[in-house]
Amino acid sequence: MPQELGLYPDLTALEFLDYMAVLKGITDRRGREQQIAELLERVRLADVAKRRLKTYSGGMKRRVGIAQALLGNPQVVIVDEPTSGLDPEERVRLRNLLGEVASRCTVILSTHIVEDISQSCRDLAVINKGQVAFQGGPGELIAQAQGKVWLVKTAGEKPDGATVVVSSMHLHDGTQYRVLGDLSAHPQATPAEPSLEDGYIWLMQGVVKE
């Protein structure tokens, strides 16, 4: 399923899925109708199946895309940036749907949204310039930044020794930075537990240097 879906705006979800099923070679009409009805239930669009696609929200269109991808019961489904641009509620709904799909087939998620990976994936790979820079579980990627994450409060200047500033928060008496690097000697540095994002950033720092 691509990030930008090529839907036909004047078709209903029912008509669109029927058309795509025919293109996929599902020629038995009764079997096609049954499969489409089941998929619409799974993606929670059965009650709006006869509405034109141009009236759907972005999240609803993504769910139509997933239903289309599942036509014909594929063994592998690839989704590209599935939650990009969605509001938090629809993002959670779509992640849960992909989790349900993953119980029936292999789902490959291509995304830059770290939260989607941490919530949905047990195995992951980091691709850099066409090469696999990392392959393993989320915990293994997080471990890349173990001992490298620090919280530092300053008057506003970036703390010395910080390789990367991950985030900064302005407070009433200064600025708190979350940084990656070796700040063990910094008097105001407090060690913090690494996140998946920290692990990814630290990994890529090493990859770029190489």
Predicted segment positions?
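Conserved ABC ATPase "signature" region
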Residues: 18, 22, 30-48
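Conserved ABC ATPase signature
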Residues: 52-56
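Hydrophobic anchor residue at the start of the ABC signature
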Residues: 66
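Conserved catalytic motifs of ABC-family nucleotide-binding domains
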Residues: 73
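Catalytic Walker B motif of ABC-type/P-loop ATPase nucleotide-binding domains
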Residues: 77-81
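ABC transporter nucleotide-binding domain
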Residues: 93-179
